[in-house]
Design a protein with these regions (language model features):
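Short alpha-helix boundary/capping motifs
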Residues: 1, 61-62, 279, 399
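Bacterial N-terminal signal peptides that target proteins for export
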Residues: 1-9
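Hydrophobic helical h-region of N-terminal Sec-dependent signal peptides
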Residues: 10-17
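Sec/Tat signal peptide C-region and signal peptidase I cleavage site
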Residues: 17-23
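Solvent-exposed N-terminal domain segments of exported/luminal and surface proteins
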Residues: 26-249, 255-257
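Gly/Pro-enriched, hydrophobic low-complexity segments
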Residues: 27-53, 81, 94, 222-294, ...
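Extended beta-strand-rich segments in extracellular/periplasmic secretory proteins, especially
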Residues: 180-229, 287-364, 374
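Gram-negative outer-membrane assembly/targeting C-terminal domains
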Residues: 432-451
Length: 451
């Protein structure tokens, strides 16, 4: 039997060994791996290029605060994938993409362009990521993260749940503002525009570091809706916590019909709480493809694959693109969408015993360069594909930062879809807006709505 002194010595030795392993991992960043943890090499067939640092400066003619000039506007599609030829490319397609291509309604196709590994981050983010590799750790059975800041916590992941946390913490500035102009698009061709002004203050990404009272707070978020008419003037302010088992999300909301600010019920901000403006097509944990506590799922890594994924979405997100042109029945207009071949981590989340989730199994395709979830295939309890979700990213090269620009949630049961975070007509997000924590909460919400 071990004595207490011996046990302490063993634990200390294990901790020292773990620290040595982490330190060794950190030396691989910028060498065997990119500074953000990706494989820098080209694919065997050369279709995925070697990583050369991404875009770190705006192209000539870019005006700060204005539309992003598409740095790849002269690229032409290499080929198009349709229902007629999808078998030729099936090893590089997701289950969801095959389902979209196979539908009898609509005219879905994927235009595949040259692969451009455009993602880049500021040097201070890479520096923080390297430090995280020596110190970040999972807590509470993987439901939280400690001792990490600014960059992804696990650039060389050792477990599937660490990949989820990398997505959750990918850097896109710490003071965010945008006006979004999404929509619900119906199979009869009609659409309902959803206009929302967003503010977000990210404690985790703050270069000054969070104060102790916000140690478990990832970010503050506030949204005020301007459309559709029945939601005009509605507002919501929320604290998104990191370990949501230890401390659930907290939110307040303003309902213009009652003219009162009230505490948001837990069901409105967690798990499968429906998002009221999405007409049944989106739930709370569908934001950013997955948002919130991972505790109700078992997470499994299915491997790393070369997949055609949405990327470099400059054309679709240009403020000159109209809703009517982009948001066609059954799926967005393929003329505006760009797909490229990239390496992705394939991550599966399956509901744990004891839970009965509508979204019982989810498969995520995770960009190796940015750690952003680019696609999600969502299955019900009968293992039927019910939703397909695609995220479209681009480099905000003025930062630089690879940003989740918008996403599309396809309801595979009826052909409707919801599109969110897109900013048509309003210009790109500001990643360094003048914000501080006092700009959130019930008092701030009251000030914003002017009541």
């Amino acid at each position: 039997m071990f004595s207490r002194k011996t046990s302490i010595a063993i634990l200390a030795a294990m901790a020292a060994l773990t620290t040595q392993v982490w330190a060794a991992d950190a030396t691989l960043l910028g060498d065997k791996f990119t500074s953000n943890g990706a494989d820098p090499s080209a694919s065997a067939d050369g279709m995925i290029p070697a990583y050369s640092g991404g875009i770190t400066n705006p192209p000539e003619g870019y005006v700060a605060g204005g539309d992003h000039i598409d740095p790849f506007r002269n690229d032409k599609p290499l080929f198009s994938i349709t229902a007629a030829n999808m078998e030729q490319y099936e090893n590089r397609l997701s289950v969801g993409q095959k389902a979209l291509l196979s539908r009898k309604k609509g005219n879905y196709r994927m235009d595949v362009y040259p692969s451009r590994r455009s993602c880049a981050l500021p040097q201070f983010v890479y520096d923080a990521t390297k430090k995280n590799a020596t110190r970040a750790r999972l807590i509470d059975d993987g439901n939280g993260v400690a001792d990490a800041r600014i960059g992804v916590p696990f650039p060389i992941p050792k477990s599937p749940i660490e990949i989820y946390w990398n997505h959750n913490f990918h850097w896109h500035g710490h003071r965010y503002h945008a006006v979004t102009s999404g929509a619900n698009v119906y199979n009869n061709g009609s659409l309902t525009k959803i206009v929302r002004e967003d503010w977000r203050y990210n404690f985790y990404a703050d270069p000054q570091g969070p104060i102790s009272q916000h140690a478990n707070d990832q970010f503050n978020w506030m949204g005020i809706w301007k459309a559709p008419p029945r939601f005009n003037g509605s507002g919501f302010s929320m604290i998104n916590t990191i370990n949501q088992l230890a401390e659930p999300r907290k939110g307040v909301m303003f309902n213009p019909s009652t003219r009162r600010i009230m505490q948001a019920p837990a069901a409105a901000v967690t798990y499968e709480g429906p998002l009221s403006t999405a007409d049944g097509m989106r739930q709370s944990h569908d934001m950013f493809l997955f948002s919130g506590s991972p505790d109700r799922y078992n997470w499994r890594l299915l491997g790393k694959r070369e997949i055609f994924v949405p990327y470099n979405a400059y054309k679709a997100s240009a403020s000159t693109t109209t809703h009517e042109a982009l948001m066609t029945p059954f799926h967005p207009n393929p003329d505006y969408l760009r797909y490229e071949l990239h390496r992705v981590w394939v991550l599966e989340a399956t509901q744990k015993d004891g839970f009965r989730m509508k979204q019982a199994r989810r498969v995520f395709y995770v960009d190796e360069d940015s750690w952003i979830f680019l696609m999600s295939d969502i299955f019900n309890n009968r293992d039927e594909l019910i939703y397909v979700q695609h995220a479209f990213i681009k480099n905000y090269y003025e930062a630089p930062a690879c940003v989740f620009e918008f996403d599309v949630m396809h309801d595979m049961t009826n052909g409707n879809y919801n599109i969110d975070h897109i900013k048509l007509g309003f210009g790109p997000a500001d990643l360094d807006y003048d914000l501080d924590p006092s700009d959130f909460g019930s008092s701030a919400l009251r000030r914003k709505i002017g009541r």
